[in-house]
Amino acid sequence: MKVVCIGGGPASLYFSLLAKKTNPDWQINIYEQNPANVTWGFGVVFSDETMENFKDADFDTYKAITDSFVHWDDIDVFHKGHKVKSSGHGFAGMQRLKLLQILEKRAVELGVEIEHDVVIDSIEPYQDADLIVAGNGITSFIREDRQETFGADVVFRPNKFVWLGSTKAFDAFTFYFNENEHGLWRGHCYQYMPGASTFIVECTDETFSKTGLEGCTEEDTVAYLSELYKEELGDDRLITNNSVWRNFPRVKNAQYYDDNIVLMGDTLHTAHFSIGSGTKLAMEDAVALIDSLNDAGGNLATALPEFQQKREPTVNAIQRA
């Protein structure tokens, strides 16, 4: 089977290595627009339960990923000087770039061909592939070009948010509820490697409109939020990485596939950052897709409907959360 993956995120990488591992005769190519060893964002989160599901799929990547983890069991919520702690959850975080490097290294070892710095705006040159995996993210042109076929439904949520990092090492999933003269703010924070954390800040559109931050620079954002969170940050600081204010896009699709094209990861669905499940969903998509293909002996007419049947209930449940 000839497989082409458009986009080299966790969904495409994990699917490709699992597919090549179980079907070494398949020709699998991944095309990614970003340079090697470059990504947006900071960290990703997994639960202990999620990792058990990946252990059986490929132990080598499971071991490399879990060896890179920082672990925590608690959720801490701060509001008006009060702290509420909930324990016993079992979470782990790691650097997003490290995850991509682990998956890519394993995929290449197994024989997957990966090309970076490849910008694709049409799948026409790849129509000779038996299977095209659309894993090219939230703004996927593949999904947009076939909106009606996929039943694509993209809704931008009203709140504004910005994705930052911090040098502060959080020992729990931490949520801050702060208020200033402009309105209410929510901070979503977790450590992903020693001395480095994700720090997402969210507010209503009404609050944001009062700040004067519309169209601001990253430096303006850091200055404003460093003042807002000066007590929480202490001697630590905020870090940027394409940290622009935006509205969260909720992506759903009624149909997960069209002929020999299948959607995965953020192209197929998004999960709100407050529950930290986007990467989990993407990698679970990969496991479900290769399992369905192997069960069907590579027959897409059987495998792709089975893939949707497996994934849709879980995806819908997480999006409702």
Regions inferred by a protein language model and the residue ranges of each:
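Short glycine-/acidic-enriched loop or helix-start segments at secondary-structure transitions
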Residues: 15, 40, 124-125, 142-145, ...
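Short, well-ordered alpha-helices that flank and scaffold nucleotide-derived cofactor binding pockets
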Residues: 17-21, 105, 144-147, 291, ...
